[in-house]
From Swiss-Prot:
Homomultimerizes to form the nucleocapsid. Binds to viral genomic RNA. Interacts with glycoprotein G2. Interacts with protein Z; this interaction probably directs the encapsidated genome to budding sites. Interacts with protein L; this interaction does not interfere with Z-L interaction. Interacts with host IKBKE (via Protein kinase domain); the interaction inhibits IKBKE kinase activity. Mn(2+) binds at D381, E383, D527. GO terms for cellular component: helical viral capsid; host cell cytoplasm; ribonucleoprotein complex; viral nucleocapsid. This is Nucleoprotein. It comes from Chapare mammarenavirus (isolate Human/Bolivia/810419/2003). Encapsidates the genome, protecting it from nucleases. The encapsidated genomic RNA is termed the nucleocapsid (NC). Serves as template for viral transcription and replication. The increased presence of protein N in host cell does not seem to trigger the switch from transcription to replication as observed in other negative strain RNA viruses. Residues 54-237 are annotated as: Binding site for the cap structure m7GTP. Its main location: virion. The record marks D458 as: Important for exonuclease activity. GO terms for biological process: negative stranded viral RNA replication; RNA-templated viral transcription; symbiont-mediated suppression of host cytoplasmic pattern recognition receptor signaling pathway via inhibition of IKBKE activity. The keyword 4Fe-4S does not apply. Disulfide bonds: none annotated. The N-terminal region is important for the cap-binding activity while the C-terminal region contains the 3'-5' exoribonuclease activity. A CCHE zinc binding site is present in the C-terminal region and may thus contribute to the substrate binding and/or the specificity of the exonuclease activity.
């Protein structure tokens, strides 16, 4: 998987700075105007109160109200802010490939953020729980004692125990004007000294990410930096805390010639151009969404901030009055014309059989395929080779709908090898597989649809064989261990959906003789369920529904032979 690579974070940052320089503008004077307005107009006794709230181990709806009220006061005092501007990007704003790339990355970002906010890392609770999870947790804490450590940790478990977790959205994150005002007023220093100190941090940021060792050296020259906390930043406790990242961001706003990402201003007129430029840099630098829970890499951070609001200051403006998340406020319209693609014949000379269905059978298949929503995540997987597939599965996790069909192989020797080492299907079980069904299904996939796969090469070859070059395949690139993480549970819960994998699977001999190799057969449908389970962190929780009737999958067998 891509996230196994070492991420060259600062190189990515420099590349993004260079390519997006035309969208940056000098902001020092505007930031200082807002900082002075906050320093003069904000009640800092309320700031101190909210800072105490953020240090509490358990925070309630009342505490959240205090934070939201103070954020509203700050927003009212500022000129630099992001506006609620929901954007739908369509063909014309970006080309087809860019739209699909953006849609895929926003979906991955959504899943990453969700996993991060639910992962207790380093003893610090990192986010929101559902109401049912809150209830279970409350009962658990009552029975076990709140202060008892639940995980090995030297940190403090910080909990937002609120009825509506969506009220937490966009209430955190640092704002340079606020950081400067708080350092000035609460640090008892002059704003001029604070600006000089933060400028030094900003200059250092042009060549590296400043760390705590750098901070210690600079604090010897700028006493006002002593206020910066040495604690590691965590999700949902920032905003009014004096973190190093907040100070660095503030320092970046003072560098007019540094092409800093922090000084980007987004407008409805330049939004799609900025996104297009970002996707271009991503492609050249091989950037990606690292789906492991944790801090965002530079590309993820920029994409999240840009897509949160289509108008304003993505990094440094007040965002507390913006509702929704990035993947909600910026959406991609991939289904302007969800017309079905042509039923293209296979190319001559390849080992894919073409057989015709009856009109009634075609009508049933068309009815089933009409229930495939082109805007939903759609997994695709096959067993067999791309030019001689024996099983095809499509699965949409949002609805639980799936398509599963079979095909008699042309290459029996290759099939038996695949059966022994992979799918465990038996030739006798596929003798009566409905001819032409697999090809007809591929031909009915909606035009320009985005498909999700674990390993895309064979899928792309299969689609190309059927003349479906319009279809986009997104490869999640899970490691082999990750992909099979839910294998046992998925087979236990859903094995009854696929009864054609009855052979014995023997792992291929390898030099390292890995004892962990699975002997479970590979089923196209169950593999799709496993891959989605890895992303969700649990097996499917909804009822699965086959869109094709069982009677259509195989030809009728005679009751007796003459």
């Amino acid at each position: 998987m891509s996230n196994s690579k070492e991420i060259p974070s600062f190189r990515w940052t420099q590349s993004l700075r260079r390519e997006l320089s035309s969208f940056t503008i000098p902001v020092k004077s505007d930031v200082l105007k807002d900082a002075k307005m906050i320093a003069d107009g904000l009640d800092f006794s309320q700031v101190a109160l909210v800072q105490r709230v953020l240090r509490k181990t358990k925070r309630t709806d009342g505490d959240l109200d205090k934070l939201r009220d103070l954020n509203r006061e700050v927003d009212n005092l500022m000129a630099m802010k992001s506006a609620q501007k929901n954007t739908i990007l369509k063909l014309g704003d970006l080309n087809k490939s860019e739209l699909m790339d953006l849609a895929s990355d926003l979906e991955k970002l959504k899943k990453k953020v969700g996993q991060t906010e639910r992962s207790p890392v380093g003893g610090v609770y990192l986010g929101n729980l559902s109401q049912s999870q809150l209830s279970k947790r409350t009962d658990l804490l009552r029975r076990l004692g709140f202060q008892q450590p639940q995980v090995r940790s030297t940190g403090v478990v910080r909990i937002w125990d609120v009825a509506d977790p969506t009220r937490l959205n966009n209430q955190f994150g640092s704002v340079p004007a606020l950081t400067i005002a708080c350092m000035t007023v609460q640090g008892g220093d002059t704003m001029g000294n604070v600006v000089q100190a933060l400028t030094s941090l900003g200059l250092l940021y042009t060549v590296k990410f400043p760390n705590l060792a750098d901070l210690e050296k600079l604090a010897a020259e700028h006493d006002c930096l002593q206020i910066i906390t040495k604690d590691e930043s965590a999700i949902n406790i920032s905003g009014y805390n004096f973190s190093l990242s907040a100070a660095v961001k503030a320092g970046a706003t003072f560098l007019d010639g540094g092409n800093m990402l922090e000084t980007i201003k987004v407008t409805p007129d330049n939004f799609s151009t900025i996104i297009k430029t970002v996707l271009g840099v991503k492609k050249r630098e091989n950037m990606f969404i690292d789906e492991r829970p944790g801090n965002r890499n530079p590309y993820e951070n920029l994409l999240y901030k840009l897509c949160l609001s289509g108008e304003g200051w993505p990094y440094i403006g007040s965002r507390s009055q913006v509702k929704g998340r990035s993947w909600e406020n910026t959406t991609v319209d991939l289904s302007l014309k969800p017309t079905q693609g042509p039923k293209a014949p296979e190319k001559v000379g390849l080992n894919v059989r073409l057989s015709h269905l009856t009109e009634i059978q075609e009508s049933v298949v068309r009815e089933a395929m009409s229930k495939i929503n082109p805007s939903h995540t759609t997994w695709i997987d096959i067993e067999g080779t791309s030019n001689d597939p024996v099983e095809l599965a499509l699965y949409q996790p949002e609805s639980g709908n799936y398509i599963l069909c079979y095909r008699k192989p042309h290459d029996e020797k290759g099939f038996k090898n695949g059966s022994r080492h992979s799918h465990g299907m038996l030739l006798k079980d596929l003798e009566s597989a409905q001819p032409g069904l697999l090809s007809y299904i591929i031909g009915l996939l909606p035009q320009d649809m985005v498909l999700t796969a674990q390993g895309s090469d064979d899928i792309k070859r299969l689609l190309d064989t059927h003349g479906r070059k319009d279809l986009k395949v997104v490869d999640v690139k899970l490691s082999s261990d990750q992909a099979r993480n839910y294998e046992e549970q998925v087979w236990s819960d859903f094995g009854h959906l696929c009864k054609k994998h009855n052979g014995v699977v023997v792992p291929k001999k390898k030099k390292d003789k890995d004892p962990s190799q699975s002997t479970e057969p590979h089923c196209a449908l169950l593999d799709c369920l496993m891959f989605q389970s890895v992303i969700d962190g649990q097996p499917p929780q909804i009822k699965l529904q086959s869109l094709l009737p069982e009677v259509l999958l195989f030809t009728m067998k005679p009751a007796f032979a003459i």
